[in-house]
Amino acid sequence: MSSVVRTLHLGLNLHGAGGHSAAWRWPGTNPSAFFDIEHYVRAAKIAERGLLDAVFLADTPAISYDVTRQPPLNGLEPTLVLSVLARETTRIGLIATASTTYNEPYNLARRFLSLDVISGGRAAWNAVTTSSPATVANFGGRQIGREERYKRAEEFVETVRALWLSWGDETIIADQASGVYANTDHFRLLDPSKNAFAIRGPLTHPGSRQGYPIIVQAGGSDPGVRLAARSADVVFTAAGDLKTAIGESERLRALSRQFGRRATPLILPGLVTFIGGTEEEAQRRKKEIDALLDLTRAMDALARSMDVPVEKLSLDRPIPEELLPDPHNIAFSVGHHRTFEALAREGRTVREIIGSVQAFGHRLLVGAPEQIADSIESWFRTGAVDGFNIIPDVLEDGATAFVDLVVPILQSRGLFRTEYQGETLREHLGIPHHDVAAETLARPSSL
C-alpha cells in the first residue's frame, strides 16, 4: 500500500466577468471586466489569499462570436496580463493559453520563459491547437486539419521545451575578475536539420528557479489526449460526470505510461460553482443569474459548440439525434462536445441543456459551501482527478465565496494546504524539476 499522501490542487479560471454567460450583467460587476487589468489583479489576489495553486487565463486571438449582446470572454494578451499579476502577487502560479497553430516556437518559448523568470518560477503554458473560423481568418485564412494541427503541436512542444533547456545548467560563469561571463560550450543548441521548424537557438536568457515553465494541455480529442500523455505536466479536462472522469483519467494515465513517463500528468477538470449560504440561496442565485441570460445567443453558442445548425434547434424540444455529429469530425472542443452530447442523448431540451451547463461544458455545482466541498472531496478520493480548475459563476464575488467558505472546509478535512510550502509552481503542484522522459523528448539530439 502506497504511503504517498495525495494533495488536492485547485486553480482559478479568470473567465472574463465569470463562468456564467450572463455574469457581465450581474449587479456590481464591471460589464467590461474582460479588458480591465484591475479586475484580474483583484481576482488573482483572492486566489492567492485562498492558497490556490494557480490562476488560469484562456485565450482565443479573435472575436469568435457576435458581441452585440455579449462581451468577449477575454481580450487582453494573456502573458502581458500575467506579467502584471506576477508583480502584484508573490506565490500564486500563472497559467496562460497560447496556440501551437498560430505561433512560432522561438517567440513563444521566449515569451513564456521570460514570464517564468519575472514571476520567480510561477509560469505555465497551456498548449492548445486552434481551429475556430474567426481565428483562422486572422491568420491568413487557411484552415488546418486536426491531424496536421496535432502533428505540428507535438513538434512545437518538443521544440519549445528544447529551447527552454538551451542554456544548460553550467553556462553562466559571471566572473567579474576574469571578465568571463559564459561558457558557450554548455549551450544545448538544436540541429536545424533535425527539427520541423529549422531552429537553432539558444534563447536570449536562461531559465528561472523552477527550471522552465509547467506545460498544460486541454485537448479532449484522441490526438489531444496523446499530446497530453506525451508532453503535459497538467491536463485541463471537461467531465460532466464521475464515470466520464474516471474513464478519461484511466485512458490518459495508461497512455502516459506507454510513453515511458515516470510521473503521469495531474488531471484538473473545470468546475463551475454557484455558492450560497444554503442550497436554497445557491439555487436562487443561479435562477437570478440565469434570468439575465440571452437565450437566443446562448442557443447559438450551443449550436456552434455542438456543430449543429442553429435553425434546426428549438428551445423547448430535444436536439434531434440525427443532427448530432461524430465527435471526431467536429471543429471545436471534443471534450466540451461530449458533455453537451450526453445531455442531448438523455432527451434534455435545448433550454434545459443551456440551464444545466455553463462555461463550455464543464461540470456545474450549485449548493452550500459544505455541499461544494463534499463533491470536490468525493471526486478527489476516487483518484480520477487531482483537483479542479474552479470557474466561479461571477468571478470576483464567486471566487471570494469559494476562498472564504469552501477552502476552509477542505483544509479542516486535511485535503488542502494551510500555507504555501514553496515559492514556485512546480513546488505547489509537486512536479519534479525534471521529468526524465519528457526531457528526453526535448533533447536537442532528437530534434
Q: Residue spans of the language-model regions?
A:
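C-terminal helical cap(s) of enzyme catalytic domains, especially alpha/beta-barrels
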Residues: 141, 145, 156-161, 246-254, ...
